Amino acid sequence: MARAAGARGPAGWCRRRGRCGRGTLLAFAAWTAGWVLAAALLLRAHPGVLSERCTDEKSRRILAALCQDYQGGTLAGDLCEDLCVAGELLFQRCLHYNRGKKVLQADWRGRPVVLKSKEEAFSSFPPLSLLEEEAGEGGQDMPEAELLLMVAGEVKSALGLELSNSSLGPWWPGRRGPRWRGQLASLWALLQQEEYVYFSLLQDLSPHVLPVLGSCGHFYAVEFLAAGSPHHRALFPLDRAPGAPGGGQAKAISDIALSFLDMVNHFDSDFSHRLHLCDIKPENFAIRSDFTVVAIDVDMAFFEPKMREILEQNCTGDEDCNFFDCFSRCDLRVNKCGAQRVNNNLQVICDKIFRHWFSAPLKSSAVSFQLQLQLQEAVQECADPGVPSGNTRRAASSVFWKLRQLLQATLRELQEAEK
């Protein structure tokens, strides 16, 4: 069997004939490149194929090691006592492992939460150099100014933003005490996780991101919300949507779509820099009971300065300038991608989410055919604007308001039908 397998393709033909021409070698190179490209595309489309198997047994071992480090004074956190001593933060099940990231479900005093970390072990994170260098018990003599400088530098590395000292409150380890060294080491591990930094920064500024509930070492806890999935008929679980069958779901979808629009406008306008979402798919969002959209995975979210830094790479064509859902254009005069993103969050949401809902008639006869047709056309225009890159922002603003008005009109028709 091994011999037969090895004889396949141009290389096998060469061995059988005993010679290879230049054309055959070129064909073999193309054949090999095709397989390499296919493998790369498979890994990009399905990164989970290289992920570890998510098991409850391994997850329990990970948390046991975390608690052992806590009891040894290596790490600290406001959830460590509940997890490791009081038994009030209880592991429930493994949700997923993905390229090192561990995501676990737990119960915290009767509340479902998610424990997250970019790495399995606390020792996987580089230590804070000041802790290694400073003499004195627990680094108690460490100058506060140096700490602030290092925290600000790590936040800038994660976000690409310069923050004032007064903005660093979410990441300050608190008063010095017997666990000060463990607190600093834990803070440093958390600051090396971009998602934690985003959630911490935005939790008091946005209803569309998860608040951080607490942490223990390198693991942090957020609210558990059921993620979307392409396996759901409506992308998100809407089984309990109020109202009559069909009409209730149509109303829920319209409410959720309006919340997506609110999130887009919020991320575009309400921070000092635009926030770009480069991995838009149902699995990265969840819906609250009031149909508010929440971004539950922001590993691929970037503020404008960081986005420009990521996009501005060498290129030989436009395809080299695509960073997941964030696209740029290749300037062939200098073989460099433009730093300006040429598509936008709304365009990708229309393409990957709204198309699923509005490309076919809504499951409710209460919405007029004309309104449904207008909504379909607006979603198509949004997903594929067909305008020069310099005009995309103006076009996005126009279609944003058009979609908003059509969705509000849809809700009015559904509400009238309920009377």
UniProtKB/Swiss-Prot annotation:
The short motif May mediate ER retention is annotated over 16-17
Its membrane topology is listed as:
Single-pass type II membrane protein
**Regions that span the bilayer:** 23-43
Please report the PTM annotation for this entry.
Among the many cysteines in the lumenal domain, most are probably involved in disulfide bonds.
Name this polypeptide is given: Divergent protein kinase domain 1C
Which parts of the chain does the record assign to the membrane side Cytoplasmic? 1-22
Q: Which cysteines are joined by disulfide bonds?
A: none
Q: Which family does it belong to?
A: Belongs to the DIPK family.
Where found, per UniProt?
Endoplasmic reticulum membrane
